[in-house]
Amino acid sequence: MTILRKSHPLLKIINHSLIDLPTPSNISSWWNFGSLLGICLMIQIITGLFLAMHYTSDTTTAFSSVTHICRDVNYGWLIRYIHANGASMFFICLFIHVGRGIYYGXXMLNETWNIGIILFLTTMATAFVGYVLPWGQMSFWGATVITNLLSAIPYVGTTLVEWIWGGFSVDKATLTRFFTFHFILPFIITALVLVHLLFLHETGSNNPSGLNSNADKIPFHPYYTIKDLLGIFMLLLALMTLVLFFPDILGDPDNYIPANPLNTPAHIKPEWYFLFAYAILRSIPNKLGGVLALLLSILILAAFPLLNTSKQHGLMYRPITQTLYWIFIANLFILTWIGGQPVEHPFIMIGQISSILYFTIIVILMPMASMIENNVLKLHV
């Protein structure tokens, strides 16, 4: 008689995805971040549901409802801070996951990579609309500035912005629809995650060597379930340390001031995980140019499979491209720092140089380095 998990129509799917899944025997801890993202998504949905039970999406009561959650709801402060800092952990895992994909050549699994980019954009949209909900100063002005960028679109821009706002400024209608989007998007993300995994399991996982690993695979359970559990415990330790000791370290103090349309904060800036894109946006003096650069800073990921000129899979044995990769990562940190700085000398110049370098490395230097490496290694196959 067949084991139930192998014959039952529903359990069979779970079995093929999480238990008997053939997995390369040599994948490192960089492969843990996929499962960590799954855990982050679960944490965010659960805490988000509990917050939604007490939150009111009305401009007059939104700020007080968040205060009420923190002061009067049992462990409301804990749920709120897990949700706020959980978003930061989510993006840390997301950046590492994408970075690992670039380093080990996972971009060549086209469908998985493209769904991943859609997931990245959807997660960014979710985080943006979520940041507006507490209706503090930075929530209000962040929403105003970022939605206003759409007015740079020729001909339809202004109409589009007013349509998104539901009026002539960010107001009650905007907050209500943003709450709706913030509620529904995580479930859309969950559906996209399943599609992401479906495509991944069609081809099988990549591995650090970049070679075909079909000859040496092991079952996912118990080997990688145990390995993932260690990662999950470390993630929870980091998250709870952040929540219980430094809950506001990644937030903005201005968001503890209720939204006031008549008073603009000194420095309007988004959450830390958007700062790199915000720095690229600000580095271009033209409004439409800035918006296009902002979009391209994320959509350039879709060009990775097209720009790949190497005969090898991944950067494991490619020292020139490896050096460029780490310069690119360092440059991302610089952009993140610049995004949080005021618009003045020397930050403007540093931001512009970093933005140029960001695109130059991806579009010109990495493909050139790959071609040089092919020639040096005589890879003309």
UniProtKB/Swiss-Prot annotation:
Which key words are in the record? Electron transport, Heme, Iron, Membrane, Metal-binding, Mitochondrion, Mitochondrion inner membrane, Respiratory chain, Transmembrane, Transmembrane helix, Transport, Ubiquinone
Q: What is this protein called?
A: Cytochrome b
Residues involved in heme b b562 binding: 83, 182
Taxonomy-wise, where does this protein's organism fall, top ranks first?
Eukaryota, Metazoa, Chordata, Craniata, Vertebrata
- Per the record, a Pfam family? Cytochrom_B_C
**Binding partners and assembly:** The cytochrome bc1 complex contains 11 subunits: 3 respiratory subunits (MT-CYB, CYC1 and UQCRFS1), 2 core proteins (UQCRC1 and UQCRC2) and 6 low-molecular weight proteins (UQCRH/QCR6, UQCRB/QCR7, UQCRQ/QCR8, UQCR10/QCR9, UQCR11/QCR10 and a cleavage product of UQCRFS1). This cytochrome bc1 complex then forms a dimer.
Provide the protein's localization. Answer: Mitochondrion inner membrane
Concerning InterPro entries, the annotation shows: Cyt_b/b6_C, Cyt_b/b6_C_sf, Cyt_b/b6_N, Cytb/b6-like_sf, Cytochrome_b, Cytochrome_b_C_euk/bac, Cytochrome_b_N_euk/bac, Di-haem_cyt_TM
Family the UniProt entry places it in: Belongs to the cytochrome b family.
Briefly state the protein's biological role: Component of the ubiquinol-cytochrome c reductase complex (complex III or cytochrome b-c1 complex) that is part of the mitochondrial respiratory chain. The b-c1 complex mediates electron transfer from ubiquinol to cytochrome c. Contributes to the generation of a proton gradient across the mitochondrial membrane that is then used for ATP synthesis.
